[in-house]
Amino acid sequence: MRGAELDRACAGLFCVGFHGTAPSPEILELVRRGVYGVILFGRNVESAEQVAELSGALKRAAQRPFMITVDQEGGRVARLRALHGFTEIPAMRVVGREGNPGLAREVGVLLGRELRAVGIDQDYAPVVDVDSNPANPVIGDRSFGRDPELVGRLGAALAVGLQSEGVAACAKHFPGHGDTSQDSHRHLPRLSHAMERLDAVELAPFRALSMAGVASVMTAHVVFEALDPQRPATLSLAVMRLLRERCGFHGPAISDDLEMKAVSEHFPLEQTVPDTILAGVDGFLVCHTAERQHRAIDLLRKAIEEGRVPRERLVEATGRIALLKKFAGDPPDVLQVRERLRATKRPELAGRLPSALPGRDPTAV
């Protein structure tokens, strides 16, 4: 594998963001280059029909299984809102207070049906960080609660519900972002927990999600000093091997956005890209800048050509992303979107979930 074939294989490990509510020339160029999917933000959303049209246009442009992905957690972090025609799901803390796996599964089913109606294939949910630090500025009510067993049980139920509707779930943020006092969108958090504590608290929900068959896991840009004082989890083999060895998860691991300040302001992209794949991460999220997206692909190709990343590792990562792409659906029927969304409405479920003001979205940076 070399030349154009190698370039396309490297691009095939990237999921990228873009600006606008229709396919831009920049995103179409990346689709042609071979990226496996896109991530949608609020900047890409005007209405349900428009999202369906956008999803379909990108899938048709790709002419291959192509992933449309989104953060649709509920509460503060949801790109698709009631004003667009979607159900306003409360924060997962509200679901956690009910303590009912059946309810969590119903929430997952509802999310999955609405996302599938507009052509979205993967939801970066559930958050299975344990809410163990009241001063945490970024997790808080995005978590199901303070009890690791509860977080794992409800997170697994929600993931099963999502995936029953053909939408890939993603457990995040491995190995745990719940006890930090800094936001990795803006800073590089550090935790000094011993392995015993990590195993009992932070890792427990990820084991539960792995056993439940979650389709993917997202990494945390957090330094775990007892394991690797130099690198955040995303770039650390010492941390990421816990996902395979302690949690038993052998599917695709996806990085959090490599443009977040926890990574971009502390590590050059020339280090970040090879370190991330060598750590055992299979897919790269690069969410904002076309120039940086192309450069990251170039840097991965260069690292493989120079032998700094074994070709076997590229093959392994490609195989795991292929598992994720099994969730890639056909372009949605735009004319049926409103009817499908109306059919998903669950007033009795809404009655069991107290509404709450979403609050500030910590991921909107």
Q: Where would I find each of the regions flagged by the language model?
A:
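Preference for extracellular/luminal or secreted protein segments
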Residues: 1-35, 246, 265-365
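Second-shell residues forming the walls of enzyme active-site clefts
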Residues: 4, 17, 25, 43-61, ...
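Structural recognition of alpha->loop->beta junctions
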Residues: 16, 31-35, 88-105, 194-214, ...
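Catalytic domains of carbohydrate-active enzymes, especially glycoside hydrolases
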Residues: 29-41, 110, 117-122
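Glycine-rich anion/phosphate-binding loops
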Residues: 46-53, 96-114, 145-153, 196-201
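Short, flexible, mixed-charge acidic loops at enzyme active sites
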Residues: 78-89, 176
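Short glycine/serine-rich loop/turn segments
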Residues: 87, 122-146, 165-169, 173-192
